[in-house]
Amino acid sequence: MAHCFGRLFWYLEKGDGSMALWGGRFEAGVAEVTQEFGASLPIDKHLYKQDIAGSKAHAKMLAAQGIISAEDEQAIAEGLTGIEQDIDAGNFTFDINDEDIHMSIESELTRRIGEAGKRLHTGRSRNDQVATDTRLGVKALAKELMEANLQLRHVLVDAAKKYDKVILPGYTHMQHAQPVLLSHHLLAYSWMFARDFTRLKAAFDAADNCPLGAAALAGTSYPLDRQMTAAELGFAGVIPNSLDAVSDRDFLLDLHYAGSVIAMHLSRLSEEIVLWSSSEFGFITLSDSYSTGSSIMPQKKNPDFAELIRGKSGRVYGNLVQLLVTMKGLPLAYNKDLQEDKEGALDTAHTLMQCLSVMAGMISTWTVNEGAMACECGVGHLAATDVADYLAKRGLPFREAHAVVGHLVLMCEKRGCNLEDLPFEVFQEASPLFERDITEALDIPSIVAARTTEGGTAPAAVAVQLGRAEAQLAADEDVFGSLTKVVEMGHGAN
């Protein structure tokens, strides 16, 4: 009788007349106005592969532990495979009344295979289920971003090889500072993105522990084998505390932070592309494929896509802050606020995948205007530091040398010329330490070649650095290749 009573009231009528899976305790359905408001299905349906993988692993473990029969486990696995294939093919209709991806799949499974589908949720709560789905999703998203990161770094390294003899002004405060190799400049970004790869891997690792078995918050009385489930899903281990398992979203914050730093690096690079492609700089010419025009000004060729990448950094930062603010006041354990944790992560990952791809395309198709860069090296007194070093190496304290050269620069400003344009007699009047070989200190290629310290811009130093960058890239590709048993994101729910 109790069994029949449970079956009779297992479902609860929802606002649309259909049934909710959690309805045994309720006498009335949800208000119609809350149906869409409370549903997460439009977002978490994108985790359908993760949800199905988690359910298959859970059912397999239940059968291994003798909690459900082998026949039920087989029916569940086959039913879930059929649902996944239908979603992949775009032949599955998601119903907002199912509330979330878990109920959507479970209700369809029960419709297809009957009684066995109702046993799937034994020993499991949606709390540990959604935490598992989300962790699997973060691993998949981090892996996708790591791959895009590697592709962009290949483009940067290839460009650094190509432009290893091109010199341009280096800037501080957006003022001419010292000359550097373009390859040196590009490798600076390569190292930034290399650090981003490390942060993405850290986010992957933070998500790489399984919450299944924590149930609602306190664990379960069923003899679950959590290690088996974790291994089936490719997790490194299990989360040791059931409260933490269902309420932790630090791993999502790690993904958001890694993504925010990537966005910041992309934005900085985009800003330079915008500047360099302007008429005032003319250092690069963007491909037509990565530019747009004006609806009124026929002459315009705008770096819209670099500007968009720069602009999208704010969007990515916003997603990080949104989750931080959501989490800051939540008591243990699960709270419905956590339903707001996935949309931002999916948006950040999608946004950055586009940005990384577009950036790689822009750099690989741009034209570097070496003449414009060389011409700009002839203004702004880029040799000033080396002239001061010239005096310091001949015994004059550097601070005094700094003052002498500062006076020479002021003289140039008043005359409207550059340091190399001053007659030798002017140098000798400024300091008797100047000799005819001062011309070497004024030669831009010689200045660059002299920067031989480790990490410097001299061609020899950059060649060493380039080798290190390639070695780091190869090592990170090995790390990427080791990321096995990741449940990849599905695209059938788009």
Report the location of each language-model feature.
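A helix-coil-helix interface module used to build multimeric assemblies
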Residues: 15-219, 224-231, 292-293, 304, ...
